[in-house]
Amino acid sequence: MTDVESTYADFIASGRTGRRNALHDILVSSPGGNSSELALKLSELDINKAEGEGDAQRNPSEQTGEAQGEAAKQES
């Protein structure tokens, strides 16, 4: 049996009949909550950085790129 045949057999055995049921499964399995709760949780986030935190949260590639740029300036 090929991969396609086994996938087809799995699909048939699942009892799903297509996209219509797939969408229903997604909606049923989503966690409870609504948009007003999401807005409340987002408003509680603290996005202000304390002084000095900005450098620690950058990507390592960004930090190394800046360090290489500074090294090139010093060599000039």
From Swiss-Prot:
<feature type="site" description="Important for inhibition">
    <location>
        <position position="16"/>
    </location>
</feature>
<feature type="modified residue" description="Blocked amino end (Thr)">
    <location>
        <position position="2"/>
    </location>
</feature>
<dbReference type="InterPro" id="IPR004171">
    <property type="entry name" value="cAMP_dep_PKI"/>
</dbReference>
<feature type="region of interest" description="Disordered">
    <location>
        <begin position="49"/>
        <end position="76"/>
    </location>
</feature>
<dbReference type="GO" id="GO:0005737">
    <property type="term" value="C:cytoplasm"/>
</dbReference>
<comment type="similarity">
    <text>Belongs to the PKI family.</text>
</comment>
<feature type="site" description="Important for inhibition">
    <location>
        <position position="19"/>
    </location>
</feature>
<dbReference type="GO" id="GO:0004862">
    <property type="term" value="F:cAMP-dependent protein kinase inhibitor activity"/>
</dbReference>
<dbReference type="Pfam" id="PF02827">
    <property type="entry name" value="PKI"/>
</dbReference>
<protein>
    <recommendedName>
        <fullName>cAMP-dependent protein kinase inhibitor alpha</fullName>
    </recommendedName>
</protein>
<feature type="site" description="Important for inhibition">
    <location>
        <position position="20"/>
    </location>
</feature>
<comment type="function">
    <text>Extremely potent competitive inhibitor of cAMP-dependent protein kinase activity, this protein interacts with the catalytic subunit of the enzyme after the cAMP-induced dissociation of its regulatory chains.</text>
</comment>
<dbReference type="GO" id="GO:0005634">
    <property type="term" value="C:nucleus"/>
</dbReference>
<keyword id="KW-0649">Protein kinase inhibitor</keyword>
